[in-house]
Amino acid sequence: MIRLFVASAVAAGLVALATPPRPAETVVVFTGDIRGYLSPCGCTKPQIGGVKRMASVVRTLREDSEALYVDLGNWTEAKGRQDQLKADALAELFARLKPNYLNVGAVEARFDPATLAALDQMAGGLLKSDALQAEFLQPTQHAPVLGLAPSPEAAILPMRKPEEVLAGRPDAIIVLFAGDRASAVRLAESAPGEGRVLIYSHRGDPPKEPMRVNGWTLVTPGDKCRFVGRIERVGGEWKNLRLIELGPEHRDDSQAHAIYESYLMRVGDENLLDQVPRLPSDVKYVGSEACRSCHMDAWDVWTHSAHAEAYATLESTMNHRDPECVGCHVVGLTTVSGFISKEKTPSLKDVGCESCHGPGSDHIIKPTVSMKAGPESCLTCHVPDHSPGFTFAEYWEKIRH
């Protein structure tokens, strides 16, 4: 009898082992909240993120399965001409990636109809919204994806409230909501969510585990194009969340690379660097060479440091005309007496003495004027996005003087 029981148990175990895992009914690859972060700056390595790696990973994930690809929106911060150029570049990239749903985020919802229509055209007519009331943005009826955004104060086109739209679409099992976590939780609480996933907007790294609210599964890709998400619907339940960090192990997508280079050329051609607002100052920048005669030891340390080659790193990546990059690779970009160009102000290119110690004109006239610098001098440029892992104690040892 015991032998029969053991044999039956073993047989049952073999049957269980032989049963293949249940296939996913739906696979979703998701991105969003790029916020203008098209590429890591490359100042230090390794860095994560960027649309070139994002495009490569998205293509790979879609090749591996019949995945739906969706983007949450919030392409840029919409703060000026450079963000407009970024939006153009992203529209061109999305036209190549062909997402199943390219959502209008809260940022894009502030655009005027003509700007939105132009972006939609550049994106191959893929821009969609179930909340924003514009005919050219209307998605296919009864599609499994619903695209929503909270209504910004400056919205020009009329918008429907997310809760109202969601209440009328119980068939939508994938909901994109370009609002923060607290707003996403309130939205999830407003409608039953069994078997449904809500992808929301989040500043910072995405939580590694889904949140469960009122039957809903809540996930996010985080911000600044640092992760690509993937999740499966198996047996009516959303599970197997993957958040792929866009590190240097992922190759650059060739089309995205070409689009990014074209964007940099437009930034240069429009001379955005010349349009950086500059503040007046009673003290003036004089260049590191002026410090040499009195501070020879410190000057020698500087000439052998990476700071003295900071501008060249931008030239090697074509970012030397990008105002978002140049400020931390030269002296005094936002001051009237600061860096203008390599040709006009060669003594102010690179991270020089005055980048940390401040303008030196008064000190030259009266050496007793204090020029001391401390850890706070570094933190303007050594921020987590550009200098991950920065600690003053460790980095100071490289330039101690």
Identify the meaning behind each predicted range.
Residues V6-A16:
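Bacterial N-terminal signal peptides
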Residues A16, P21-R22, K284:
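Hydrophobic, well-ordered secondary-structure scaffolds
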Residues P20-V228, W238-N271, H304, M318, ...:
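N-terminal catalytic scaffold of extracellular/periplasmic and nuclease hydrolases
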Residues E25, I34-P40, E237-H401:
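Short sequence/structural segments immediately N-terminal
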